[in-house]
């Protein structure tokens, strides 16, 4: 599965890489788990509704969520900070 980031998703990832290595490790673990199975695993995966239908989220911590969109051959990371 190919992993790509939106510009906003990459900006969030870089923010964590520069400010908090622990959160960056958690995000990397979530991404690896999503690549194995986008719909089950760590971080309480849940499908989003409404305008974000087709997207999924997983918990990075109590405040922040990793929002992503899985397709057949690609995983798009949309957001890695804040709550959707």
Swiss-Prot record:
PANTHER family with a match to the protein in the record: TOXIN YOEB (PTHR38039:SF1)
Gene3D superfamilies with a match to the protein in the record: RelE-like
Protein known as: Toxin YoeB
GO function term, MF aspect, one: RNA binding
Highest rank taxon of the organism: Bacteria
Function: Toxic component of a type II toxin-antitoxin (TA) system. Has RNase activity and preferentially cleaves at the 3'-end of purine ribonucleotides.
Quaternary state and interactors: Forms a complex with YefM which inhibits its toxin activity.
Classification of source organism: Bacteria, Bacillati, Actinomycetota, Actinomycetes, Kitasatosporales
Biological process, per Gene Ontology: negative regulation of DNA-templated transcription; RNA catabolic process
Family from the record: Belongs to the YoeB family.
Catalytic residues of the enzyme: 46, 83
Broad enzyme group: hydrolase
EC number from the UniProt entry: 3.1.-.-
Ranges in coiled-coil conformation: none
A Pfam family it matches: YoeB_toxin
Alphabetic keyword roster: Endonuclease, Hydrolase, Nuclease, RNA-binding, Toxin-antitoxin system
């Amino acid at each position: 599965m190919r992993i790509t980031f939106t510009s906003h998703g990459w900006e969030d990832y870089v923010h964590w890489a520069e400010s908090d290595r622990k959160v960056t490790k958690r995000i990397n673990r979530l991404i690896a788990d999503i690549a194995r199975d986008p719909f089950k695993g760590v971080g309480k995966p849940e499908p989003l509704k409404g305008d974000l239908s087709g997207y999924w989220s997983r918990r990075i911590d109590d405040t922040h969520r990793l929002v992503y969109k899985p397709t057949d051959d690609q995983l798009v990371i949309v957001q890695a900070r804040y709550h959707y």
